Amino acid sequence: AGLLGQLGASSTITKIRKYSLDLYKDLEKTTGLSTGMKQNGAITVASTKERMQELLRQATTAQLSDVEVEVLNKKRLKELYPVLHSEDIVGGVYMPKDAQADPVGVTNVLAKAAKMEGAKIFEKTPVKKILIKNSRISGVETDKGVIDCEYVVMATGMWSRQLGEEINVSVPLYPNEH
């Protein structure tokens, strides 16, 4: 399942994440499809005082961004998550509106909504180059020919960065092993 946490590394990312949760709910109604989204919350625990201090800073940041957050002591952690082995746990935070969704469901909802607004989606059509004319995107060159367009959505995952570099656009994505 895809995790949909609200708190990001910056206030801008947090706003985008919160917006996405609302967008997915709205698009489910619009498209009649399901994202499989469940807002069951997220708990992060700390096993050291230092980690708990870090979680408290994150909780403060969350509150400043209007993200609902609850700081948890051991007792409250056990209430929320009874199977937790809490002997070595100092505390934690709970974000009740964080969610999870089915990545395939989200993709299908976004694709249908885009098509309803007039977008065309070309699957199995690798883009070789983004074409620029008069400092604007004019199309894409693919292995099946040129497609004229005003807008391009780069949905190439970690390869978006390379594609962006070719047209002097910074896409701050980096592969990360996890």
Residue ranges and their predicted role:
Residues T35-K38, S86-E87, K144-V146, A155, ...:
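Solvent-exposed alpha-helices and their adjacent loops that cap or buttress functional pockets
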Residues A1-Q6, N40-T44, M158, E166-H178:
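Central beta-strand plus flanking loop segment that forms part of the substrate or channel wall
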Residues E54, Q162-L163:
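Phosphate- and divalent-cation-binding pockets in alpha/beta enzyme and binding domains
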Residues E68, K120, S170:
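Residue-level detector of anion-binding/catalytic polar loops
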Residues G2-L80:
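Dinucleotide-binding Rossmann-like beta1-alpha1 core, especially the glycine-rich loop
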Residues L33-T44, Q58, S65, K78-E117, ...:
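Helix-loop-beta segment of a Rossmann-like dinucleotide-binding subdomain
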Residues V93-Y151, A155-Q162:
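Helical element adjacent to the flavin cofactor pocket in flavoenzyme catalytic cores
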Residues A1-G2, K18-Y19, Q58-T60, H85, ...:
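Short, glycine/charged-enriched secondary-structure capping and boundary segments
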